């Protein structure tokens, strides 16, 4: 039996625009992804007697989850068929706009895909079958994604503020499907694909002028998001504040570690009703 320890980083959408909808009701998106040092931990056993996915601190079915679906998909394209058992310690908030389930699926796909010599292009195609965030999480690097998540432009040299605080209302979750199903717009956001900056300095201007098109829908289900964003925008030295994904987690970016630490400390002392992470962009 082989044993592995794998980390799955949380994602943050610095902006998220909805540019249209396909006939199958999937939305076309354009989004800038970053990944942060908040990790789920996966303990993976390959070739043992157990099979399934086990969550140490959550009640989630061991067979009905993104990681199990990823394993089953990979086994269909592998020359081997061993038992795979995964124990997951969840540190990424669930149903919070941080792609925890997608990150976990991508982490197991990276590990087993490499072990079983599965072509990376096939791996990307399989990732999309699990969820629209999984191809981006497969990369876990700063990137621009469009389409339904399958069209990815890696931006490894993009210079952004490195320090980020994540804030979510305690006890509140938001289903991605619920938010998207309730999203209605008379006009979609125009595509910015032909306006992506060439110069590094212009990216922050683009990010600041962008938005999260899902915010209005998320506020209907979790109105606390509005107060979180208001407070984050008032923080000293905050570069930008926005909601990530379908919510309800919001973030603020900082150029200096000390500024992020001061902001996180202040919030932790004054807002016990909020969950706060002080993190760094990878």
Swiss-Prot record:
Reaction(s) the record says it catalyses:
4-CDP-2-C-methyl-D-erythritol + ATP = 4-CDP-2-C-methyl-D-erythritol 2-phosphate + ADP + H(+)
Q: Which GO terms describe its molecular function?
A: 4-(cytidine 5'-diphospho)-2-C-methyl-D-erythritol kinase activity; ATP binding
Please report which protein family the annotation says this sequence is part of: Belongs to the GHMP kinase family. IspE subfamily.
Looking up Gene3D superfamilies in the UniProt record yields: 3.30.230.10, GHMP kinase, C-terminal domain (3.30.70.890)
Q: Where is the active site?
A: 11, 133
Outline what the protein does.
Catalyzes the phosphorylation of the position 2 hydroxy group of 4-diphosphocytidyl-2C-methyl-D-erythritol.
Keywords, A to Z? ATP-binding, Isoprene biosynthesis, Kinase, Nucleotide-binding, Transferase
**Which biological processes are named by the entry's GO terms?**
isopentenyl diphosphate biosynthetic process, methylerythritol 4-phosphate pathway; terpenoid biosynthetic process
Which named protein is this?
4-diphosphocytidyl-2-C-methyl-D-erythritol kinase
Q: What EC number(s) does its UniProt record assign?
A: 2.7.1.148
Pfam family of the protein (one): GHMP_kinases_C
Key word Hydrolase present = no
Q: Source species, please? A: Ehrlichia chaffeensis (strain ATCC CRL-10679 / Arkansas)
Q: What class of enzyme is it?
A: transferase
Concerning NCBIfam families, the annotation shows: ispE (TIGR00154), PRK14608.1 (NF011202)
Record-annotated residues binding ATP?
93-103
Pathway this chain belongs to: Isoprenoid biosynthesis; isopentenyl diphosphate biosynthesis via DXP pathway; isopentenyl diphosphate from 1-deoxy-D-xylulose 5-phosphate: step 3/6
């Amino acid at each position: 039996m082989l044993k592995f320890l794998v980390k799955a980083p949380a994602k943050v959408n610095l902006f998220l625009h909805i540019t249209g909808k396909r006939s199958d009701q999937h939305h076309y998106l354009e989004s800038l992804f970053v990944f942060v040092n908040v990790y789920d931990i996966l303990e993976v056993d390959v070739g043992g007697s157990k099979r399934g996915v086990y969550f140490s601190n959550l009640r989630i079915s061991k067979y009905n989850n993104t990681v199990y679906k990823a394993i089953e998909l990979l086994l269909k394209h592998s020359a081997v068929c061993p038992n795979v058992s995964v124990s997951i310690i969840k540190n990424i908030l669930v149903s919070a706009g941080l792609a925890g389930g997608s990150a976990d699926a991508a982490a197991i796909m990276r590990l087993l895909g490499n072990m079983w010599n599965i072509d990376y292009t096939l791996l990307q195609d399989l990732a999309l079958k699990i969820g629209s965030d999984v191809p981006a999480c497969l990369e876990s690097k700063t990137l621009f994604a469009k389409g339904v998540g399958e069209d990815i432009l890696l931006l490894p040299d993009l210079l952004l503020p490195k320090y980020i605080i994540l804030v979510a209302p305690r006890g509140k979750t938001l289903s991605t499907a619920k938010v998207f199903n309730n999203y209605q717009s008379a006009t979609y956001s125009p595509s910015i694909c032909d306006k992506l900056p060439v110069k590094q300095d212009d990216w922050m201007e683009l990010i600041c002028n962008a938005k999260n098109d899902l915010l209005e829908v998320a506020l209907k289900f979790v109105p606390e998001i509005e107060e979180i964003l208001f407070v984050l925008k008032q923080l000293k030295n905050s570069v930008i504040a926005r909601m990530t994904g379908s919510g309800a987690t919001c973030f603020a970016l900082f150029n200096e570690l000390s500024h992020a630490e001061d902001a996180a400390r202040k919030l932790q002392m004054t807002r016990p009703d909020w969950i706060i992470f002080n993190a760094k962009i990878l």
